Amino acid sequence: MTLLMIFTILLVASSQIEGHLKFDIHDAQHYFETFIINYNKQYPDTKTKNYRFKIFKQNLEDINEKNKLNDSAIYNINKFSDLSKNELLTKYTGLTSKKPSNMVRSTSNFCNVIHLDAPPDVHDELPQNFDWRVNNKMTSVKDQGACGSCWAHAAVGTLETLYAIKHNYLINLSEQQLIDCDSANMACDGGLMHTAFEQLMNAGGLMEEIDYPYQGTKGVCKIDNKKFALSVSSCKRYIFQNEENLKKELITMGPIAMAIDAASISTYSKGIIHFCENLGLNHAVLLVGYGTEGGVSYWTLKNSWGSDWGEDGYFRVKRNINACGLNNQLAASATIH
């Protein structure tokens, strides 16, 4: 049975109530068995399967509630549907300000702090819609797996697009180099994007993924400076109150690594998110564009949960409502040599 057929079965088995996707909780066992086939889930014993079903059923109820609240976004069963919220945040995010106990950090390079306090300049002629995916400036969506390396993926994603803008050529850069060699962050236990940029300035450069492939676990640092694909010349940390100020920075500086609260987006499928938790920052993503659809203005963000999540690995949130906690002091970007 193909993936498309299985998804069709799920959608037919569910019902549309007032335009919203709603699953019949009485059919939760059916949805769960289909989910197991769809995502090739394997549980070691019946006890574990029953435990996962309990979580799955709770997530179904949560999906129904989200679909009721969000009139321009759809939530659905996906690969995370048998995980609790705590499991998702522990294994699949990774934003943290904690530092390794044995941290060795050079003080030679720091990001400049940029305050975007002034209202957007009305004379700036910015396009109504913008997206760095246009003209082939974004690499494919990656999957961090069960490693809290979102910070590395967001930082590296920024640099990949900057390289494409400068050279009109896409390359995949190495998140694993940061996981193994960045002594100021905590590998799969989390980190910060601006700190990653600072550490890359200190290291001298970043290798390509083909030369330093992703493992999703911390290993011995294997930097080879003869294989650096680029170097980071400077970086910025943004402090802003008005989200609209990000539009000009996005266009002139390139994609911006952003911190969000990902607690309520795990089952996102498509559309523009209106209602999103903002209880604490825990995940890093990449701001790549903005636009308007159906009268709703939105930001487009690239995630690191694989292309089988969301809108081919991307998601959209409504602009100017601090959706998912976007208004924070951890946004960062860089420039390259």
UniProtKB/Swiss-Prot annotation:
PANTHER family given in the database record: CYSTEINE PROTEASE FAMILY C1-RELATED
Domain of life assignment: Viruses
Gene name per UniProt: VCATH
Family: Belongs to the peptidase C1 family.
InterPro entries: Papain-like_cys_pep_sf, Pept_asp_AS, Pept_cys_AS, Pept_his_AS, Peptidase_C1A, Peptidase_C1A_C, Peptidase_C1A_papain-like, Prot_inhib_I29
Keywords on record: Disulfide bond, Glycoprotein, Hydrolase, Protease, Signal, Thiol protease, Zymogen
Function: Cysteine protease that plays an essential role in host liquefaction to facilitate horizontal transmission of the virus. May participate in the degradation of foreign protein expressed by the baculovirus system.
Active site (UniProt): 150, 283, 303
GO annotation (BP), single: proteolysis
Residue ranges listed under propeptide: 20-126
Source organism of the structure: Adoxophyes honmai nucleopolyhedrovirus
Name under which the protein is recorded: Viral cathepsin
Catalytic activity: Endopeptidase of broad specificity, hydrolyzing substrates of both cathepsin L and cathepsin B
